[in-house]
């Protein structure tokens, strides 16, 4: 019974702290009804946990009960909010530095189904043939129905060299398909670059990491030495996103000082933020084509949306993923944490792309691979690989043709002309 008393004590302290927080958040009189309802609900919550602790057929550790309750609460909020146990919380910092163990796959919950945003280029999932939009229905034979996002991530990670089987459903497949994938230490190089044709440069962003903005500058300076860049293809296809600040750093390299890149709105005042171009280093003297597809999400959509709204780039490809919310990682006292949606972001013209995505100015579909078609053998030389890709990639071909046409016409902005000044309403 000492364990039961401990659970009750912890829960009642939590309830009192929550009520105190609510009281300090505003006028007591105006919120008294809400506080009373909250207290009654917490009493019910405590009552249920106490019954489980005393009458459930098997003994359950108190922390497991509390963790399960927290997970259930967050699962009911939205697809991107989740509870992080101490192990998962420690791993959260790894992805932003560009190195972690697993399959190399970005996932989310879409319509309550575990869905692939994109496989990261060059990783085991990418080589295995996993595609954006694939629905993961089983992990190692376990159904993913009602599985929390953080739990799915944890199950797919593991020791490099170990194997895992995931089952996916895909449009065009009559039944689920099993993929056996060997885990690797995932090291993501966020920026790759090359020359498509003389004067037409190519920058591929795989993720938005801490040094992505700096790496973009390095690539541009490399190709601008001795010759002038006459056009740029910025490839954001299958880029699942990353750091908001990094997406702002990339966007502002192509916008005049003071131009709005993105703004966020949330319930808490400190979540209402505006990010403007600093003007530290602006590349404004050549046209840009931004490539997007279904695997372009979050930070990728911030960049595409900002450059599109200001008429700085033509967006080409297919509809992007549509993740327009901001998650904040909040540490908890026992080493665990919350990944909580705290705001939504908007493009300079006030567009929310959440659940909608960025619509390209020019839609170019990619041909679907034939059944049983194998990917081409890898080419180690980066420039040779890029030239080979250009032969097989209709979206990239169209981007180059468009830049060549702009070059002939001596244009440095979008063909449609300069946009009107965005009208932005921020609370």
Model-derived regions: residue spans:
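Cleft-lining beta-strand/loop regions that shape enzyme active-site pockets
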Residues: 2, 28-41, 45-62, 115-119, ...
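Terminal targeting/pro-maturation regions of precursor/exported proteins
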Residues: 2-81, 114, 226, 389-398, ...
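Extended, small/polar residue-biased N-terminal targeting/export presequences
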Residues: 56-117, 161-180, 187-193, 246, ...
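Short clusters of hydrophobic/aromatic residues that line enzyme substrate/ligand-binding pockets
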Residues: 83, 261, 275, 321, ...
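Short Gly/Pro-enriched turn/cap motifs at secondary-structure boundaries
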Residues: 95-97, 157, 353
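Well-structured core secondary-structure elements of compact alpha/beta domains
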Residues: 113, 199-200, 204-211, 365, ...
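Conserved functional hotspot residues or short segments at active or partner-binding sites
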Residues: 337, 344-427
């Amino acid at each position: 019974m000492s364990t039961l008393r401990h659970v009750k004590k912890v829960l009642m302290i939590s309830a009192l702290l929550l009520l105190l927080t609510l009281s300090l958040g505003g006028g007591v009189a105006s919120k008294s009804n809400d506080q009373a309802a909250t207290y009654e609900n917490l009493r019910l919550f405590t009552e249920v946990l106490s019954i489980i602790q005393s009458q459930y057929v098997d003994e359950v550790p108190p922390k497991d009960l509390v963790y399960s309750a927290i997970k259930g609460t967050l699962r009911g909020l939205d697809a991107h909010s989740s509870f992080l146990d101490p192990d998962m919380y420690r791993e959260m910092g790894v992805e932003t530095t560009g190195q972690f163990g697993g399959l190399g796959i970005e996932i989310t919950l879409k319509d309550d189904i575990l869905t692939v945003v994109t496989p990261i280029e060059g990783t085991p999932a990418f080589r295995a043939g996993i595609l954006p939009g694939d629905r993961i229905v089983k992990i190692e034979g376990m159904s993913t129905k009602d599985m929390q996002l953080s739990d799915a991530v944890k199950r797919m990670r593991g020791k490099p060299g170990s194997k895992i089987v995931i089952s996916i459903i895909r449009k065009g497949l009559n039944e689920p398909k099993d993929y056996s994938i060997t885990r690797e230490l995932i090291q993501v190089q966020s920026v790759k670059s090359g020359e498509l044709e003389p004067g037409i440069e190519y920058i591929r962003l795989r993720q938005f990491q801490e040094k992505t903005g700096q790496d973009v500058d390095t690539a541009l300076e490399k190709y601008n030495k001795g010759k002038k860049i006459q056009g740029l293809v910025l490839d954001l296809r299958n880029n699942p996103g990353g750091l908001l600040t990094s997406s702002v750093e990339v966007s502002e390299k192509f916008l005049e000082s003071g131009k709005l890149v993105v703004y966020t709105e949330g319930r808490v005042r400190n979540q209402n933020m505006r990010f403007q171009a600093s003007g530290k280093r602006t590349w404004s003297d050549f046209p840009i084509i931004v490539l997007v597809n279904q695997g372009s999400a979050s930070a990728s959509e911030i960049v595409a949306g900002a450059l599109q709204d200001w008429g700085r780039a033509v967006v080409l490809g297919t509809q992007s993923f549509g993740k327009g919310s901001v998650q904040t990682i909040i540490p908890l006292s026992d080493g665990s944490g919350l990944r909580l949606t705290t705001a939504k972001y908007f493009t300079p013209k006030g567009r929310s792309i959440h659940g909608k995505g960025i619509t390209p100015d020019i839609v170019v579909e990619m041909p679907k691979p034939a059944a049983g078609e194998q990917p081409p053998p890898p080419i180690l030389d980066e420039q040779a690989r890029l030239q080979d890709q250009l032969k097989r990639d209709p979206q990239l071909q169209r981007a180059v043709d468009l830049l060549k046409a702009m070059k002939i016409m001596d244009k440095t902005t979008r063909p449609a002309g300069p946009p009107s000044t965005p009208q932005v309403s921020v609370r």
